[in-house]
């Protein structure tokens, strides 16, 4: 009996500690230039849009069918990402300390963008909103469609890295929510109807939340939870309760880097963890990957993308 119990516990630990290998999707064209610094992506119908951090007057787009064909073929040809027009005000003149775009979200033909700024050592978030043309895919954001949003705490170069829709509100997720940074963590809900903001309480989670999927019909969504050891001083990590409950995978056991996906749900007007196990990615120890974007890929898994560290990477993460 004791021997059986030991074997069972070992098997459970092994299952919970399993890491997922990702599959790269090769792209070509200007999107691969590290200077673009892809910071967000979202689906509009069957088109995947990529948001560069730097203001250049365009986004990038590839289609779902192109991704499917790439993943199904052994002889993969790089997907050429097309540029689509992104008409906005010159935010470098409109927003003091404008630092770039952080996230994008579509809701029918409505588009929401998260913007980061740092002025006089004060971090601020902004939300801007506009529309997309169904035929040309041009996105237009009028100068008046912008609202400044106060961050929950002050950490240099950190603001709202994710936008997702929930009950006709744009939910802006702040990226640093550790127990040593916020006693009562919260995120921001923006109402497009009256442009008012409100708070939604949340559990604490260590490290950074760098992007999130859309909310599903059950109020659940997945996020990228990333830690680069160079951020230790800024993030002041507390106990990692997730790794205390779910053992580290092989590559995570020998590294201080964390690359994983965590599922949350919105329940009783609060953001909490679900019972889903974290998805740990097999690490590339030589090159930590700053995953900045995530979307669901049907019921098959996720697509995730880096900004420029170590380079622009688009990858598929299978569910199993």
Short names for language-model regions:
Residues 8-17:
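Hydrophobic h-region of N-terminal signal peptides that target proteins for export
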Residues 16-320:
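Sequence/structural signature of beta-propeller domains
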């Amino acid at each position: 009996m004791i021997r059986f119990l030991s074997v069972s516990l070992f098997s459970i630990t092994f299952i919970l500690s399993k890491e997922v290998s990702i599959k790269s999707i090769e792209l070509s064209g200007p999107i691969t230039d590290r200077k673009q610094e892809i910071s967000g992506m979202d689906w509009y119908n069957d088109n995947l849009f990529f948001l560069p951090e730097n203001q250049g007057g365009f986004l990038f787009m590839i289609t779902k069918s192109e991704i499917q064909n790439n993943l199904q073929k052994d002889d993969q040809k790089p997907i050429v990402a097309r540029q689509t027009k992104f008409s906005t005000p010159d935010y470098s003149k409109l927003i003091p300390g404008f630092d770039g775009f952080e996230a994008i979200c579509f809701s029918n033909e409505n588009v929401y963008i998260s913007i980061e700024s740092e002025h006089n050592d004060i971090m601020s978030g902004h939300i801007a909103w506009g529309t997309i043309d169904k035929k040309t895919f041009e996105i237009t954001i009028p100068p008046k469609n912008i609202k400044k949003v106060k961050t929950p705490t002050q950490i240099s170069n950190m603001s709202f890295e994710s936008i997702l829709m929930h009950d006709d509100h744009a939910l802006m997720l702040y990226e640093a929510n550790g127990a040593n940074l916020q006693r009562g963590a919260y995120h921001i809900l923006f109402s497009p109807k009256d442009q008012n903001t409100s708070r939604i309480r949340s559990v604490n989670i260590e490290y950074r939340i760098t992007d999130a999927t859309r909310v599903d019909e059950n109020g659940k969504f997945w996020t990228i939870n990333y830690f680069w050891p160079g951020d230790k001083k800024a993030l002041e990590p507390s106990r990692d309760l997730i790794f205390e409950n779910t053992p580290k995978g092989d590559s995570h056991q020998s590294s201080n880097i964390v690359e994983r996906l965590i599922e949350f749900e919105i329940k009783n007007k609060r953001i909490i963890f679900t019972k889903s196990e974290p998805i740990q990615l097999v690490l590339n120890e030589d090159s930590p990957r700053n995953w900045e974007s995530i979307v669901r890929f049907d019921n098959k898994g996720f697509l995730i993308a880096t900004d420029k560290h170590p380079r622009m990477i688009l990858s598929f993460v299978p569910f199993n």
